[in-house]
Amino acid sequence: MEIPFATDWLRLPARKDGNETRLAYFRRQIILSKPPASCPILITADARYKLYVNGCFVQAGPQKAIDATAWYVDPAELAPFLRAGKNAVAVEVLYFGSDGHSSLLETRTPHLYIGDENGRLSGKSGWRCTAVDGVSFPKPQNTPSGTREDAAGEPRFSGWKTTMYDDSDWEDAVPYTLYEKLLKGGPFCLVPRTIPLI
């Protein structure tokens, strides 16, 4: 699989450079005249993602990077989950921050990459996003992962993975530009994952 120089990264518009672990939601709605026979995409995130289509779990990833020379990207086939009419693609992104596990590469805020040659879901525009304030990650003592999750249910996110959800109070996700990458570093060198998806 040949992966072009990766510039279709998205981030939250309110950049919050810091050490804390954070959770963010990204979503996009598309309208299809009929279900496609195939809808392949490439997806990865800083540092972990869970991908959903129309409320159905598709997959989680990416494979953990070994060093700063490569960031693993996953293929995903969305066609089995798509239907005629309105569709919702939703991604939960967990960012560990610099207080996270020392072997995890990181930017400075939750990031999502979507590569789509057909242009239906390209990361260049059309994505909505929000930070999730009801989930916190206090740093515990003596845990190998370096994080613990404390989650309080937020009614405002009920159904956020479905087409029925109203994301009008969310913000537009913004591109993580080449300029930012050159200035602050970032995961632009993507390589295919080397182990099977679980």
Each language-model region and where it sits:
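Short beta-strands within extracellular/lumenal beta-sheet-rich domains
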Residues: 20-32, 71-78
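Residues that flank catalytic or metal-binding motifs in active/ligand-binding sites
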Residues: 26, 47, 72, 108, ...
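Aromatic-lined ligand-binding clefts that engage carbohydrates, nucleic acids, or primary amines
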Residues: 30-33, 37-52, 87-91, 170
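Short, flexible loop/turn elements at secondary-structure junctions
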Residues: 34, 45-47, 65, 80-82, ...
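An acidic-aromatic loop/edge-strand motif
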Residues: 1-16, 90-198
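Beta-strand-rich ligand-recognition modules
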Residues: 50-106
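Extracellular beta-rich ligand/substrate-recognition surface
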Residues: 14-24, 62-71
